[in-house]
Amino acid sequence: MGNQIAEKEKPSHLQHHFVDSDQQFESSKFGMWIFLVTEILMFGGLFVAYIIYRSWHPDLFYLAAKELDTALGATNTVVLIASSLTIALAIRAVQLDKIKAAINYMAATVVLAGTFMVIKYFEYTDKFAKGILPGAGYTYDGIAHDMAANFFSIYYMMTGLHGIHVVIGMGLIIWMIVKAKKGAVHSGYYTPVENTGLFWHLVDIIWIFLFPLLYLID
């Protein structure tokens, strides 16, 4: 009888294998940080490959980077920094039970993320039209050298993988909007929104490293 009463007193968001909400929160946060570390390791390998190739052929990397549109890259940097602000405001709004404001901030984050992807689409299509493709598909006459093709292979791999993470982040944020509308997140339970925010901040930070490494080679 006592156990049944205790079960009824548990909040609906508390999973059965946790003692209380605090334990669930700490476990979820720890798990999220472990996941983020694996993401950093994955991108870290690509950064190492970039550094090695650039150290071997600095002049060619410099010339190849000139084919990238710095203005579009800078615009996307501003867009993602703004999205970091809106997702942070969304988390704070949920903590204060300002659910409508949180939904608006999350929607703004999705719009900014979509803007990032649209800009990246135009950037990619411009490269494709010139024959600047990864690997064996590289046919651009402006820089006729194998290492230029390697630079763009790294460029597409790093920015493409980052773009996939942006799309995943958009999906997660939309899911959080749905949960917020259903009342599933609030001041007493905002772990999913906070973890989504952590993922989104990582996506932003990775781009902040990618932008100078790829677009601002000197």
Mark where each language-model region is.
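...captures the hydrophobic TM-helix bundle architecture rather than a specific catalytic motif
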Residues: M1-D218
